[in-house]
Amino acid sequence: MSEFWLCFNCCIAEQPQPRRRRIDRSMIGEPTNFVHTAHVGSGDLFSGMNSVSSIQNQMQSKGGYGGGMPANVQMQLVDTKAG
């Protein structure tokens, strides 16, 4: 006994992908609240943790990073086991 497959393309309509809206330069505005704090290159990040720490200290010394407010947060841990 053999199997016979027949595909009817007329019955299966592929849904067209929604068109993505093209963005041009006129649709992009100027940055807001931008503060330039440091130059970081790929070599800086791969040179070790001392360099990363140095970059973090440099950025914090520029200001704008100490404005956080303390908050008490309570979270409940739920242990889920696959079974």
From Swiss-Prot:
It is found in: Cytoplasm, Cytoskeleton; Cell membrane; Cell projection, Phagocytic cup. Residues 28-41 form the CRIB domain. The keyword Lipoprotein applies. The modification Phosphoserine is found at residues 42, 51. It is a lipid-anchor. GO terms for cellular component: cell projection; cytoplasm; cytoskeleton; phagocytic cup; plasma membrane. Keywords: Cell membrane, Cell projection, Cell shape, Cytoplasm, Cytoskeleton, Lipoprotein, Membrane, Palmitate, Phagocytosis, Phosphoprotein. Probably involved in the organization of the actin cytoskeleton by acting downstream of CDC42, inducing actin filament assembly. Alters CDC42-induced cell shape changes. In activated T-cells, may play a role in CDC42-mediated F-actin accumulation at the immunological synapse. May play a role in early contractile events in phagocytosis in macrophages. Belongs to the CDC42SE/SPEC family. Interacts with CDC42 (in GTP-bound form). Interacts weakly with RAC1 and not at all with RHOA. PANTHER family: CDC42 SMALL EFFECTOR PROTEIN 2, CDC42 SMALL EFFECTOR PROTEIN HOMOLOG. This is CDC42 small effector protein 2. The gene is Cdc42se2.
